[in-house]
Amino acid sequence: MNDKQKESSMIEGLKSYKRNIEAPWGLLFYRIIWDQLGQLKNKKILDYGSGFGVTANELAAQNDVTAIEPNKDMIKLRYKQNTYQQLVGTIESLKQEPNQKYDVIICHNVLEYVKDREALIAEFHRILKKDGFISIVKHNKLGKIMQKAVLEYKVEEVLTLLENRNVKSS
């Protein structure tokens, strides 16, 4: 596979992932997250690992949002109905930020891809205001299995996944 084919394949994969986000269960996930975050208004927010910018875009309606994402292809497909600052970057980008800059830091479905989690959390702590908070969401493999059963009605696929993982229900 040449570079152009690899890039095309990656873009198609990202488009498929974006369709999943826009499916009813993806929309439900985000509505639950936003409800748990509460009414944020006039806050300085960092969305680290912003992906397609779903959360950054939503929160930018009433807040000053900076989104950082390393994947340029995801940024090309991002949501941008509301105005927010989108940066291409990694933990190195955080090191350029001043101390205690953000009221809220969002880190959703990112930690599983970070090599040095301790360094990332230390940077979050440094740039978070004293009265601020961090919202962390991490993928849950068993949750994905339940999603297939409950939301996608793929019971046979779920049973196969459970058998292959030696997961038992009580």
Where are these regions (language model features)?
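A short SAM/SAH-binding and catalytic strip from SAM-dependent methyltransferases
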Residues: 104-116
